[in-house]
Swiss-Prot record:
It catalyses: [(1->3)-beta-D-glucosyl](n) + UDP-alpha-D-glucose = [(1->3)-beta-D-glucosyl](n+1) + UDP + H(+). It is found in: Cell membrane. Keywords: Cell membrane, Cell shape, Cell wall biogenesis/degradation, Glycosyltransferase, Membrane, Transferase, Transmembrane, Transmembrane helix. Disulfide bonds: none annotated. Residues 1-491, 543-558, 605-640, 725-1441, 1507-1516, 1697-1708, 1763-1772, 1837-1871 are cytoplasmic. GO terms for biological process: (1->3)-beta-D-glucan biosynthetic process; cell wall organization; regulation of cell shape. It holds the Pfam family FKS1_dom1. It comes from Arabidopsis thaliana. The gene is CALS4. This is Callose synthase 4.
């Protein structure tokens, strides 16, 4: 066998890495990717053309192999192998080489036989010359006719082919021909020019490209390429197309791809801004556009300079030409973009970028000035300008490494022990720190904490005397404590506490004292206020203690002075209050309030306050110093006076109602009488030991009774907020015309107004649309004058585009499509729009019947037609169509003359109103029938019907047949035949919803639409990790519980499946399965109905389609518009116009998907990467950004390697040389930009880091963030340019909005009742909830997608999210916090909607709620919320609290109220106090009863009812509410209350917050019992068991009555215990129960855990993970955990005195002590048993059994003795169990908290055994009732109806699905 020639590596990749016939170029190891992949791709292109050339290209790849030295002696192969990877040490390299080699050995002979020339060298030369002749030369001859992508592809291919040719010639010692060398030199030069581009092709031959012909882009290009005044570095070769960015790259050493990326970014930014301005000089860059961009881009930098007291580095030459000044502005602007584009993770630190930019801009200024100076000296070079990539390695990398090192500490450390992004950024807010850091950055500065050697900085610098440590937290420390709630919102808590004190004083003294005395006592609230102020000052110092060394001097002084002042007032207030004259105390109060008077007075004049707060003037700062900390952010946030008045009135009404209700009805006044009576009642029958015997007036009882009342007082504001916000939101929505069109009937009634509304809203119009209150009361619409007008044509094309989109999405059938489409052809004699047939349904048959019955009564018929405009239009159109049809069908002059005469007579009678009187229309129904038959025959156009047609024509007028316009005949036929059935068109509920919402939105307030050229440009960004892209055939057919996803979707969407079959022209599923190529269509159909990336991409790419159509409307003339956009798209004559439309759309819109793992998926052959590539091929404008991890081997370091990271952007590569057009699998991507990073970019929260990586590739002035489980619609895309105009309108505010909030539609609501509950809850939040947040409250933030950001504003202020680990878990809302703190404004708009998928299973929903609760817990600790709470005015602060963490805190108080109430009652009944009090506690229960379900009903139901009522009618809202209750919605919401409570408290106490991926799948399948137990054990089951025991004890010893509040607690207990099983599909199926029991037993087995065993497999592993958070909790968290665990000992303390031996006999503490002795003996016994089991259980089983029997007998002997002596009664055994269970659990909690102290093998093993026993018993007790109910089949049927009732109403036959499961299983069992 011949030795394989050198370089043979290509096709072997394929045989091992990918099982196809040719190699996959995408599976090359990352270390070889850059060199090998281009060769493999070219090989694939030429494979079928010349197989030997393919093989020879493989030969060149073989040169990477040295470890298998087949070609020893060939020095070139060895050299190249050593150069790339001589030891094959790279990841997968050896495997790659071996596989290639195997293929080469197999295919060498076959390729030799196919060789056409005498040698490989001649073969390769022949092919190269052929390629040059046929490829390159044809390309050069084509010139402008070829696209830039084609040119790029061909030149890249030619370069690769030459490399192979050169290698083969050198191997054969043959010189390459001179002609080929000359050709190659030219190709090499061209290849450097024609590089892959993103949007703008900037190569010289692209001047005729539609985008490059735009005068604005030409002007910007001309401006940035003006470099004649710039001095280049010595040796630099200047090219004609170089620009100012190239100069900046050369001087500051930026990366090439960064420069290319920001060049396009800058060009598009400037061009888009210039498009909106009035042109002065069309071919020159307008200074106004440049100033606008520069001001917005560098606005934050200028503010920063003013704040830190630095002179701006933006300095411009005086008395210079405009070109020079403009060039300087471009340099400054470009410099910032280049810094930002290469800053990587530093983009989260905007002021750090300001610091870098400040120094680099000053160096730029010095360079430019030195060049223009008259003095002769060498121009100054930048500090970091030595080598390529110096900016990355010397500026970005040191800061990045500091971030990375700090992030490593975040793993298990406390927030206070490491610096997050905000801490590091705030370092740059202080000039003293900037001076310490210096420029160039000092390696030993306290910012870094690293040595200069580690950072690679200048080691020769002298170290300043800064100490060895690094600076810590600067302005804020996140301490994990509940006190953050008081510290952040101290004014609110002070208000509540002082109001409560005042109300109690008034109620207590209402009848006993005079008004003056009561007033004097009420004034004592200021003493309390002083104490609260001191407490707040103490909290500020305590929680900032760890930052005491690093915070600025003025901040320290402020804290100290506030504490001292507060302490002084705490002393002065009581002294002055005790003075006999009240006036002195009032004077003291006025003096006390004076420091805060100025800010509160300025609240009424917000403009002055904003000015003062934003001022950096020292005297002003001194005045504001007391009330406002000197921070860079959080200043000037106040709204306009009108906005302040609105939310002030909102809160005045709310607080007045709340306080009045609390005082008069609920809490204060009604309780005063019972409280006084309790305090006066003696307590002789006290059963328990008294710890405080000298306390008088039963104060302990009063505290016990009042504690839950106080908690309710602090909690019920949330309920009042729900009430008031619902009313305000509903009223506001009604004025905004929400829900005006609710049904198809309403749509039909107002459809004729749609063209006018469309014209007013979506067509650029000089007339200003009505807004505000004028629009709220207006129903007037613009009218379209006639059918031949441009507006009518635009509306019909837009409407038809929407309807066609419905058909493509299979929402409507072909027949519905025909009924919904509008005719695009107009009759000259008709003066109205030809409406869709569904609007005219049954009008013709009715009109015919009316005409027959009204024979002779023409005026009556005319009046009927005048009243029904649709009927009139239908009759007139039908008449015109028949006239046209007959004139077309009939030939012959005499026949035509006869027809003309007949129609002339009819027209004459119509004009004279004598049609019915002069003509007999009684035969009109027969004539109607004949025309129906005629249209049917003509439509079918069959030869056999020609005789029939002739017969019909003879009956109506002797006509002949002729083929005419089919669409017109179709429409006429539908007009004649369609009756009542079309009244329900479309039948699909989703299509109805979308049509009604779109139509309704046209009557809502929105900005006018600008022309496409004048609209703001924008991008959409979707972060994607590893979710489903496109369902595979395997996934669709794989059965889960006997049901496949495809089968499930077919039942969920039966009408859409039927429409799909109709679209692909398959009558049955069998026909569908028989056609292979339709499998891809099935995958798409299913993916469009799931939460997949494919669905999201399709929706977002509707933007492109909408913009192209709108651009066509703007650019087309009358004639082109009448032809329609489709004719322009299809015809060659319209290609130029359509190319211009596409170019405009590309300029205005960019879509980037941030696929973080794309390169990993691609190199591993993951199907998700191929599906993403398919999306890029389907949508050429789609771009994918990803993180590329490239391994590079160090040749001289014995095979060591290093990973480098890149931000990369790819698009679908052009397929120039695809030999088989049907080969859809030959798809490749093409790297556009690849920007090197300083290290792994994911060092914080993954999602925001992923967004940050991709944001540099977005374009435009706005950025829409879209999640990968969202959907979009073509009709909504038409309104995007209106929405973007909101950025240019203040809408009554003082600032332009920086975030535009949009409403969402939850499209997963139909899956199950849980999905319905969740979607209703979510829908009310994203509509009425956010409506109120935005207006009037002005506290809407960013709650995720699909909000639209002011992109330039946010990219200079930290991005669209925050990424610090854990603290920014809810990364979205922090973007809203950040925007508001930096003087941004967030608005909300409901005339546009985006689809959103939500979780559909209980476990999914609970994980989502857990994530949000965790995030809210972290928000509570955050600096953002603290600053908002302090910088907002009082009323806006209240809004901020109750709409963020306040909701979760009030949910926590709701549950705590239950605990406090029950433990209080436990104390009362066990101590005998309740018996002494009689009926007094009844009052407490009555008051608390109103709070039981109010929280759930009002917080969840009220907004839902209001919003559903607005949008669909209040009858439907009431019906839905009742139906939700029948489907146990109260159970669901009560259960979720427990989820919020558990995870919010756990996060605040111990941390442990983490991202919880909920999945995007269809979760309607059964969850195992063990899985539910693991997830809900500690969050619900344990707490429910505790409450159940409390209720049980209370009912045993308490009164016999059962109050409403007690019933509600029992309901909560039952819900928390059994809701997971009640909402679990097939939860009561017996076969599932059996399987669950087996799985539970396997999981709960003791000692089956250990290292590496996942929690899903072992109870031990799960338990260790469950208590893991305690190991990392702080000391205070452990103390609080232990303190709360002590509550379980109350059971033992109370119940031990209820034993028959001690009851009413002994009340000494020795009884309680003796009980502990018994417990310790019992625990010791358990320990002995556990020890014996471990030591003797295996080898000495007999001895172990003897020990167990002995202990058992001893226990029984003692028990029988006690029973015999009557020391223990049977009921005492039960009481002992009730006391022992909580006590043991309390000991277990304490032991778990103290694990580091007691982690001895013996002790910890005992703890584990105790925990295992509790879980075993609790799980078994839970399982018993479930198994019992599974015996009864009707329970399972009821559960199925309850879970899936909503789906039943939409045609979902869940019973068929479940029966399919059972049949499937039974068939398996039989097999």
């Amino acid at each position: 066998m011949n030795q394989p020639n050198r370089g043979q590596i290509l096709q072997t990749v394929f045989s091992h890495f990918f099982p196809v016939a040719s190699p996959d170029s995408e599976l090359v190891p990352s270390s070889l990717h850059e060199d090998i992949t281009p060769i493999l791709r070219v090989a694939k292109d030429v494979e079928d053309t010349n197989p030997r050339s393919l093989f020879l290209q493989d030969l060149d790849i073989k040169s990477v192999d040295d470890s298998i030295n087949i070609l020893s002696g060939h020095s070139h192969a060895l050299d190249k192998a050593n150069e790339l990877d001589p030891t094959s040490s790279g990841r997968d390299v050896r495997q790659f080489k071996n596989t290639i080699l195997q293929w080469l050995e197999k295919n060498n002979e076959s390729t030799l036989k196919a060789r056409q020339k005498s040698s490989d060298a001649h073969e390769m030369q022949s092919f190269y010359q052929q390629y040059g002749d046929e490829g390159i030369n044809d390309l050069l001859n084509a010139g402008a006719g070829s696209s830039s992508s084609q040119r790029t592809k061909i030149y890249q291919t030619a370069v690769v082919l030459y490399d192979v040719l050169d290698a083969v010639h050198r191997k054969a010692n043959i010189k390459v021909a001179a002609k080929i060398l000359e050709s190659h030199a030219e190709v090499e030069a061209k290849n450097k020019i024609y590089v892959p581009y993103n949007i703008l092709p900037l190569d010289p031959d692209s001047k005729n490209h539609a985008m490059m012909r735009d005068p604005k882009i030409v002007a910007v290009l001309k401006a940035i390429r003006y470099t004649s005044d710039l001095t280049w570095q010595i040796g630099h070769k200047i090219n004609d197309d170089e620009d100012v960015l190239d100069w900046l790259k050369t001087m500051f050493r930026f990366q090439k791809d960064n420069v290319s990326n920001q060049r396009e970014h800058l060009i598009l930014l400037l061009a888009n801004v210039q498009m909106r301005q009035t042109q002065r000089q069309p071919n020159l860059l307008d200074d106004r556009a440049l100033d606008t961009v520069m001001e917005k881009l560098l606005g934050n930098y200028n503010k920063w300079c003013n704040h830190v007291g630095l002179e701006s580095s933006l300095r411009f030459p005086k008395d210079k030409q405009q070109k020079v000044v403009q060039q300087r502005k471009l340099l400054y602007t470009g410099l910032y973009l280049l810094i930002w584009g290469e800053a990587a993770n530093l983009r989260f630190m905007p002021e750090c970028l300001c610091y870098i930019y400040h120094h680099m801009a000053f160096e730029l200024f010095e360079m430019l000035e030195s060049k223009g100076s008259k003095k002769k000296y060498k121009p100054k070079n930048p500090t970091y300008s030595g080598k390529d990539e110096d900016f990355l390695t010397k500026v970005v990398t040191p800061v990045y490494k500091t971030i990375a090192e700090e992030a490593k500490k975040s793993g298990e450390g406390k927030h206070s022990e490491w610096r997050n992004y905000d801490d590091l950024n705030e370092y740059f807010w202080s000039k003293q720190y900037l001076d310490k850091l210096g420029w160039p950055m000092k390696a030993n500065a306290d910012f870094f904490c690293k040595t200069s050697q580690q950072l690679g900085l200048n080691k020769s610098e002298k170290k300043p005397d800064l100490g060895d440590g690094c600076v810590g937290k600067v302005n804020f420390v996140e301490i994990r404590t509940f006190w953050h709630l008081f510290r952040s919102f101290d004014r609110m808590w002070s208000f509540y506490i002082l109001s409560l004190q005042a109300m109690i004083i008034i109620a207590w003294n209402e009848t006993s004292e005079s008004g003056g005395a009561v007033f004097h006592k009420v004034l004592s609230v200021f003493i309390t206020a002083a104490k609260l102020n001191l407490f707040q000052a103490f909290l500020d110092i305590a929680l900032s203690w760890k930052a005491r060394h690093s915070m600025s001097t003025h901040v320290r002084q402020r804290y100290i002075f506030k504490a001292v002042a507060a302490a002084v007032w705490v002393l002065l207030m009581p002294l002055t209050y005790a003075y006999s004259h009240t006036s002195i105390f009032i004077v003291a109060i006025l003096i006390y309030l004076s420091p805060n008077m100025l800010p509160e007075m300025l609240l009424l004049i917000p403009s002055i306050r904003r000015t003062l707060e934003k001022s950096d003037f020292r005297p002003v700062k001194l005045i504001m110093w007391w009330s406002q900390p000197e921070l860079y952010i959080g200043r000037g946030m106040h709204e306009s006076a009108w906005s302040i008045y609105k939310y002030m009135m909102f809160w005045i009404v709310l607080l007045t109602s709340k306080l009045a209700f609390s005082y008069y009805v609920e809490q204060i006044k009604p309780l005063m009488g019972p409280t006084k009576e309790i305090m006066s009642v003696p307590m002789p029958g006290y059963w328990l030991p008294e710890f405080f015997p000298h306390v008088k007036n039963n104060r302990g009882v009063v505290i016990t009774l009042w504690s839950p009342v106080i908690l309710v007082y602090f909690m019920d504001t949330q309920i009042w907020y729900a009430i008031v916000s619902t009313l305000v939101g509903g009223l506001y929505g009604a004025f905004r015309h929400i829900g005006e069109i609710q049904t198809l009937g309403m749509l039909r009634s107002r459809f004729q107004s749609l063209p006018g509304a469309f014209n007013a809203c979506l067509i650029p119009n000089e007339n200003t649309k009505e807004k505000g209150i004028k629009l709220a009361f207006s129903r007037k619409c613009h009218k379209i004058p006639n059918t031949n007008g441009k507006e009518a044509k635009q509306f019909s094309q837009m409407w038809n585009t929407i309807i066609n989109s419905f058909r493509e999405e299979d929402l409507i059938s072909n027949r519905e499509l025909e009924l919904l489409l509008m005719s695009c052809w107009a009759y000259p004699d008709l003066d109205f729009i030809r409406w869709p047939i569904f609007l005219l349904a049954s009008k013709i048959p009715i009109a015919v019947d009316i005409a027959k019955k009204r024979n002779g009564k023409h005026r009556e018929l005319k009046n009927i037609l005048a009243e029904d405009n649709c009927m009139s239009c239908a009759v007139r159109e039908c008449y015109a169509s028949i006239k046209k049809l007959l004139n077309t069908l009939v030939t012959g002059n005499s026949d035509l003359m006869l027809i003309t005469t007949v129609f002339t007579i009819i027209d004459t009678h119509i004009e004279k109103d004598t049609l019915l009187t002069e003509l007999n229309l009684s035969v009109l129904p027969d004539l109607h029938g004949h025309f129906v038959k005629l249209t049917e025959y003509v439509l079918q156009n069959k030869d056999k019907d020609k005789i029939q047609i002739v017969n019909v024509l003879l009956k109506i007028l002797e006509m002949v047949t002729k083929d005419i316009l089919k669409e017109e005949i179709k429409r006429l036929h539908l007009l004649l035949t369609v009756k009542e059935s079309a009244m329900d068109v479309p039948s699909n509920l989703e299509a109805r919803r979308r049509l009604t919402f779109f139509s309704n939105s046209l009557f809502m307030e929105m900005p006018g639409a600008p022309k496409i050229q004048n609209m703001l440009s924008f991008s959409a960004l979707t972060p994607y990790y590893s979710e489903d892209v496109l369902f595979s055939t395997f996934d669709l057919e794989k059965e889960n519980d006997g049901v496949s996803i495809l089968f499930y979707l077919q039942k969920i969407f039966p009408d859409e499946w039927k429409n799909f079959l109709e679209r692909v022209k398959c009558g049955t599923e069998e026909e569908l399965d028989a056609i292979d190529y339709l499998k891809e269509e099935i995958r798409l159909w299913a993916s469009y109905r799931g939460q997949t990336l494919t669905k999201t991409v399709r929706g977002m790419m509707y933007y492109q389609k909408a913009l192209e159509l709108q651009a066509f409307f703007d650019l087309a003339n009358e004639r082109e518009l009448m032809k329609g956009y489709k004719s322009a798209e299809a015809s060659s004559s319209g290609s130029s116009l359509w190319a211009e439309c596409q170019a405009l759309a590309d300029i205005k819109f960019t879509y980037v998907v941030a696929c973080q793992q794309y390169s990993i998926h691609k190199r591993s052959g993951d199907q998700r990467a191929k599906d993403i590539l398919t999306l890029m091929t389907t949508y050429p404008s789609l771009r994918v950004a990803y993180i590329d991890e490239v391994e590079q081997t160090h040749i001289y370091s014995k095979g060591t390697s290093e990973n480098f990271y890149y931000s990369a952007l790819v698009k679908a590569a052009p397929q120039t040389y695809s030999t088989d057009s049907s080969d859809s699998g030959h798809m490749l991507d093409q790297v556009i930009y690849q920007i090197k990073l300083p290290g792994p970019p994911i060092i914080g929260e993954g999602k925001p880091e992923n967004q940050n990586n991709a944001i540099i590739f977005t374009r435009g002035e706005a950025l829409q963030t879209i999640d990968m489980n969202q959907d979009y619609y073509i009709e909504e895309a038409f309104k995007m340019r209106n929405l973007l105009q909101e950025f240019l309108e203040k809408n009554g505010g003082v600032r332009y909005p920086t975030i535009l909030g949009l409403r969402e539609h939850i499209f997963t609501r139909s899956v199950s009742c849980l999905a319905w509950f969740m979607s209703n809850q979510e829908h009310s939040f994203v509509t009425i909830g956010q409506r109120v947040l935005a207006n009037p409250l002005k506290v809407r933030f960013h709650y995720g997608h699909p909000d639209v950001f002011d992109r330039v504003f946010h990219l200079t202020r930290g991005g669209v999210s925050k990424a610090s680990k854990v603290i920014n878990l809810s990364e979205d809302i922090f973007a809203g916090f950040n925007s508001t703190l930096r003087e941004g404004t967030v608005s909300h708009h409901e005339y546009i909607q985006v689809g959103k998928g939500r979780d559909v299973g209980l476990n999914q929903i609970s994980m989502f709620e857990a994530k949000i609760a965790n995030g809210s817990g972290e928000q509570t600790l955050s600096r953002d919320l603290y600053r908002l709470g302090h910088q907002f005015d009082f009323f806006r602060m209240l809004s901020c609290y109750f709409t963020t963490v306040g909701f979760y805190f009030c949910s926590m108080l709701t549950v705590l109220t239950v605990y406090v109430f029950l433990y209080g009652r436990l104390y009362l009944v066990l101590s005998g106090v309740e018996k002494e009090l009689g009926n007094k506690p009844m009052m407490m229960e009555i008051i608390l009863a109103s709070q039981s379900f109010v929280q759930i009903v009002f917080l969840m139901a009220m907004p839902m009812i209001m919003e559903i009522g607005l949008e669909r009618g209040f009858y439907d809202a009431l019906f839905d509410f009742v139906l939700m209750q029948l489907q146990l919605a109260s159970v669901f919401f009560t259960f979720q209350l427990g989820t919020k409570f558990h995870y919010y408290c756990k996060t605040l106490l111990h941390g442990g917050a983490e991202y919880r991926g909920t999945g995007r799948g269809f979760v309607v399948f059964h969850a195992k019992f063990a899985e539910n137990y693991r997830f809900y054990s500690r969050s619900h089951f344990v707490k429910a068991t505790e409450l159940g025991i409390l209720l049980l004890v209370y009912h045993i010893f308490g009164p016999t009555y059962i109050g409403l509040f007690t019933i509600s607690i029992w309901f909560m207990v039952g819900t928390w215990l059994f809701a997971p099983f009640l909402f679990n599909p097939s939860g009561f199926e017996w076969h599932e129960i059996v399987e669950d029991w087996a799985d539970w037993k396997k999981w709960i087995e003791y000692d089956n855990g250990g290292i590496g065993v996942p929690p899903e497999k072992s109870w031990e592993s799960w338990w260790e993970k469950d208590i893991e958070h305690l190991q990392h909790s702080g000391k205070w968290g452990i103390v609080v955990e232990i303190f709360f665990a002590l509550r379980f000992f109350i059971f033992q303390y109370g119940l031990v005195y209820q034993l028959s031996a001690f009851k009413n006999k002994y009340s000494s503490l020795w009884v309680f002590g003796a009980s502990w002795l018994l417990i310790l003996i019992l625990l010791l016994t358990v320990t002995v048993l556990d020890y014996a089991r471990r030591r003797l259980g295996t080898e000495f089983q007999l001895l172990f059994r003897i020990i167990k029997v002995s202990l058992f007998l001893a226990f029984m002997a003692i028990f029988i003795t006690l029973m015999t002596c009557r020391l223990i009664l049977p009921q005492d055994v039960f009481l002992c169990m009730l006391a022992l269970i909580p006590t043991g659990w309390g000991l277990l909690l304490i032991a778990q908290s103290c694990k580091p102290l007691i982690q001895q093998p013996g002790i910890w093993s005992w703890v584990m055994t105790l925990a295992w026993v509790y879980d075993l018993v609790m799980g078994s007790l839970l399982f018993i009732p479930i198994a019992f109910m599974a015996w009864f089949p009707f329970i399972s049927e009821f559960q199925t109806r309850m879970l899936f009732n909503q789906a039943f109403s939409r045609g979902l036959h869940i019973s068929r699905i479940l029966s399919g499961q059972r049949k499937h299983r039974s068939s398996k069992n039989k097999d």
